[in-house]
Amino acid sequence: MAVINSGFGNRRGASNSRLPPGQTLVDDWPVLTAGLTPDIGAHEWTFTITTETGTEHGWDWNALQNVGVEDIVTDIHCVTHWSKLDMAWRGVSLDRLFEDVETSCDYVMVRSHGGYTTNLPLDDLLDGQAWIATEAEGEPLTPEHGGPARLLVPHLYFWKSAKWVREIRMMPSDEPGFWEQNGYHLRGDPWREERYW
């Protein structure tokens, strides 16, 4: 089981060393969505990594489960100032999914069912930092929380953990996704308060 903790000590008066600046702890898990909630069943869900040459590496639900699901306990931090600590997740590490992907790109665009996009540096998805999550707190992800599968990138603000994930497309240069086009920071590190431009 992977246990991730991004804390670096008390920063600017935070009462909890695991709480980034400007964040407030919550016990519940707020639902925030930019649009309508897609209804995608696990039987119809697919996920693709597309390289800059157009080569596609794809998985359906069963194939994803066979890659190797792992347990993760981590903190999540939303740009709207809430944090939830010690969330239990199950998912597949992107390290496993990228094993056979050949690319010279440094950036990706994550695409979701419903049209949502978010950009990330490839380095933020590898080395045990990101997963395709299928469960949270011991239950399958509900549609409201991105089910059947969402990206989980807990070291960045939670808008980078795209719900209803369907594709990661490699990009040679950084391009803004949905929220990034609307004033959100290109990277979104909560410890640096990278909320907006």
Language model features by range: what are they?
Residues 2-197:
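Structured, non-membrane catalytic/scaffold regions adjacent to prosthetic-group chemistry
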